[in-house]
């Protein structure tokens, strides 16, 4: 990790570098294929990696949480440790609700949040969040289907 981050930073500058991790802290009873590494000690593994990124002075750290229906949440002590060891911007993504993002933001653990599926169903998502408007529900049956249906046809909010 260190060698790659340093090499890229030397070419484009560390403030143009971001790194994404997808830490998985627990499994579920659900059978699934994990596309990545399931660590025996994810807390210490990722905290040590975050320290490497802090030392490299990169611009941001992106933490992608598992986003299936019964996915485990990141533990609170990991949120705290990530912020404690990384002074740049921290972006969280992966099944974030507005409420969860606000909790992480208010605790000072994160700076930015990715809302993939809610954005698909709510083309005006920032205005909905700002105004406390209800969100459209995502129709999962139309996702990943190969057409524009379910991607460009959700309505904007109207009273």
Task: Identify what each model region corresponds to.
Residues 1-159:
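Flavin-dependent oxidoreductase catalytic cores
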């Amino acid at each position: 990790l260190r060698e790659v981050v340093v090499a890229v930073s030397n070419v484009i500058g560390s403030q143009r570098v971001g790194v994404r991790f997808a830490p998985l802290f627990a499994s579920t009873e659900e059978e699934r294929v994990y596309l990545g590494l399931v660590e025996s000690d994810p807390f210490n593994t990722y905290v040590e990696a975050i320290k490497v990124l802090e030392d490299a002075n990169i611009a941001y750290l992106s933490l992608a949480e598992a986003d299936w229906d019964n996915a485990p949440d990141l533990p609170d002590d990991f949120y705290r440790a990530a912020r404690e060891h990384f002074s740049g911007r921290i972006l969280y993504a992966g099944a974030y609700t507005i409420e969860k993002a606000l909790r992480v933001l208010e605790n000072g653990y994160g700076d930015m949040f990715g809302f993939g599926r809610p954005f698909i169903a709510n083309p005006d998502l920032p205005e909905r969040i700002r105004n406390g408007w209800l969100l459209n529900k995502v129709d999962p049956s139309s996702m990943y289907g190969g057409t524009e249906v379910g991607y460009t046809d959700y309505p904007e909010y109207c009273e």
